[in-house]
């Protein structure tokens, strides 16, 4: 994702990230008075490795007939497929069936009803929802898909103003990043520094010429161990 998430690499075992759920309290006091004691409260965001993988096998005949580097082409394709799968899971992951939990279904993430590709007022509603959670304005982005971008380029903020919702790669002053991982009529807005990507490994690629040697085919297997977490769910709003 091109939204500057927090990256944790080289992890081992399960990981717990401390999260402050309430702050201490300040008081005005009289001369020689003492403020009342207060304490922060903490909980933890837990991350456990989830494995995403893909494999293909290709024949000896394909190697003989092709003038290109087939193995390199297949490796590149597998890497792109896994990256695309991870991008989708970061947004829509169910948290079940060995899949990480994505932003959309994380408890505490704000929601906003979106009509078709959204009105200017609906986008302002998303911004207000996130700002009320004291998210970091400097790290806020919109994620929209290419169809939404096209529609919003001709959607006026108000009638007969010639001012459009999407201008200069921004929506209302916030960067708008286009990702076709977003379904039509879905919009994600928030402080993406609060989204954590944990990686227990790089992309592990294995070339196996032996398993199907009698058939003359070669297997390429790719595996990667990752998990996602949202440190401050209120820093996001999902529109749909």
Each predicted region: which residue ranges?
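Acidic/polar, low-complexity extended loops/arms that serve as protein-protein interfaces
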Residues: 1-137, 177, 183, 229
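Extended oligomerization regions of viral-like shell subunits
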Residues: 11, 16, 94-227, 232-235
